[in-house]
UniProtKB/Swiss-Prot annotation:
Keywords: Metal-binding, Methyltransferase, RNA-binding, S-adenosyl-L-methionine, Transferase, tRNA processing, tRNA-binding, Zinc. Its EC number is 2.1.1.215. Disulfide bonds: none annotated. It holds the Pfam family TRM. Coiled coil: none annotated. Zn(2+) binds at C247, C250, C266, C269. Residues 2-375 form the Trm1 methyltransferase domain. This is tRNA (guanine(26)-N(2)/guanine(27)-N(2))-dimethyltransferase. Changing H110A: Decreased tRNA guanine-dimethyltransferase activity. The gene is trm1. Changing E6A: Does not affect tRNA guanine-dimethyltransferase activity. SUPFAM superfamilies: S-adenosyl-L-methionine-dependent methyltransferases (SSF53335). It catalyses: guanosine(26)/guanosine(27) in tRNA + 4 S-adenosyl-L-methionine = N(2)-dimethylguanosine(26)/N(2)-dimethylguanosine(27) in tRNA + 4 S-adenosyl-L-homocysteine + 4 H(+). Changing C266S: Does not significantly affect tRNA guanine-dimethyltransferase activity.
Amino acid sequence: MEIVQEGIAKIIVPEIPKTVSSDMPVFYNPRMRVNRDLAVLGLEYLCKKLGRPVKVADPLSASGIRAIRFLLETSCVEKAYANDISSKAIEIMKENFKLNNIPEDRYEIHGMEANFFLRKEWGFGFDYVDLDPFGTPVPFIESVALSMKRGGILSLTATDTAPLSGTYPKTCMRRYMARPLRNEFKHEVGIRILIKKVIELAAQYDIAMIPIFAYSHLHYFKLFFVKERGVEKVDKLIEQFGYIQYCFNCMNREVVTDLYKFKEKCPHCGSKFHIGGPLWIGKLWDEEFTNFLYEEAQKREEIEKETKRILKLIKEESQLQTVGFYVLSKLAEKVKLPAQPPIRIAVKFFNGVRTHFVGDGFRTNLSFEEVMKKMEELKEKQKEFLEKKKQG
């Protein structure tokens, strides 16, 4: 056992292995620090929004680090409910709550199966649920949606990025009933498929799970949703389901909402058009929520520098919410550009914004044809420059 510090919290954890697996009885993954930073900031947003004490749930708690940080680092938690089916996890959680001197009336520790914990004990009672399963969150979504109060927030993590991003398309179809696209913006496609699934599962109960933030990092996706009720709100979300048609030859892409408007061939090069979806084609970021996360993170010393850097990038990205983005190196390779310009220059050239998904990725409102035309223009300018340089 060893003691580690994260944020303000200190916790006892088993010795951290090089490889994390679901077979471990209790684990603490230091690589998920940014994820937990975001969960704390998301809860603080809810504190400010509601202006009252809140109840939070961590149904797959493991070491208890999330629930402990929620109690120590936010301003409104009345009580945190930490749950894990592992008896070893329960022992470690108890030690960790004591280690941080948290009063016993501010938390409860339970050892139930996560769905049972969410449904049986506190139906419609939680203001904030942080769900961080090992793998897909699908088996827990309905229980989470039913356990939350109206206006509550779900902080959701998914680590099964391989199926969602196209490595295992059949698995993606079974779990999410959608086709992934293994292209340069495959992780965004995966996030949009996951959002669609969350909305779909909650919609069965006339619950609207409205996406307000999306983030892709390392091996996981991080999403936030606000819970609302009413068939009109649910229908409005479902209206924002659609498909992406993509050409793997020329990188052309089109968003389609009408099944009758599918194209078999790419109108740009004539190659086969592939289909991704159904998926969410609406906004990935609520500007108010995203701006709050960024601004709150800058004020806090306990928040990682990496978290602050990522939030700055996402804050800028949220100003231009396209479906899909372009990767400069892929475009440069396609048109045989003599020299790839720095991404900061390319962003200005395309009137776009950088994306957090890929280091040299950018979003733009320009059409695919306009993007390729500007790439050809850039190519000609570079050729002229190199020719002049050659001539002295």
